[in-house]
């Protein structure tokens, strides 16, 4: 079964778009990318040039990038459009919409690769029955380098940082979560 890449927040989209051709690196392993409606909204709501580039990239890859509608995502988007929500209420909405989509079966079966911007991970127990692999942005880049897809993770990380994404940490975390003790570790690299 093919691993699906899930973004629990929009941070990786902003980091990868900061580098020329960077968004295509998200598809480089040949794995489908799944976003929830709220993650897409979070990345494109401003209407800035960067947001429009992300929106255009998503639209240009309908067979590789899938946007899943969620109940919470639709409610949050409506309240943000109506300007009835507070900024503090946005905390962790992306993560919660991803787990809503998983719980409702809207994403299908795993294994899943959760791509996080930083080294703050959800408690592995939260993944439940799903075989999951958690990886940081830099861990993803290192995986691409080790697979021969890119020549240097360090160069791309440096470009991200020099193009406004200074907060992307050079932390390599790449860890599997088994759905049960008997299951094999998940893998994601080609």
Segments (PLM) and residue ranges:
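Active-site-proximal, substrate-binding regions of enzyme catalytic domains
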Residues: 2-113, 121-190
């Amino acid at each position: 079964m093919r691993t699906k890449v899930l973004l629990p927040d929009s941070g990786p989209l902003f980091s990868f778009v900061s580098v020329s051709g960077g968004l295509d690196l998200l598809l480089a392993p040949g794995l489908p990318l799944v976003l929830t409606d709220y993650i897409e909204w979070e990345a494109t709501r401003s209407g800035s040039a960067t947001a429009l580039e992300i929106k255009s990239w998503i639209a240009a890859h309908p067979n590789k990038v899938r946007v899943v509608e969620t109940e919470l995502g639709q409610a949050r988007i409506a309240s943000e459009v109506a300007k009835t929500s507070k900024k503090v209420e946005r905390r962790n909405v992306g993560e919660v919409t991803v787990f809503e989509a998983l719980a409702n079966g809207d994403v299908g079966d795993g294994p899943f690769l959760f791509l996080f911007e930083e080294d703050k991970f959800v408690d592995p127990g939260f993944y439940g029955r799903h075989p999951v692999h958690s990886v940081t942005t830099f861990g993803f880049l290192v995986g691409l380098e080790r697979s021969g897809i890119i020549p240097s993770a360090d160069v791309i990380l440096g470009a991200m940082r020099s193009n406004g994404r200074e907060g992307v940490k050079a932390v390599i975390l790449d860890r599997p979560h088994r759905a049960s003790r008997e299951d094999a570790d998940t893998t994601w690299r080609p």
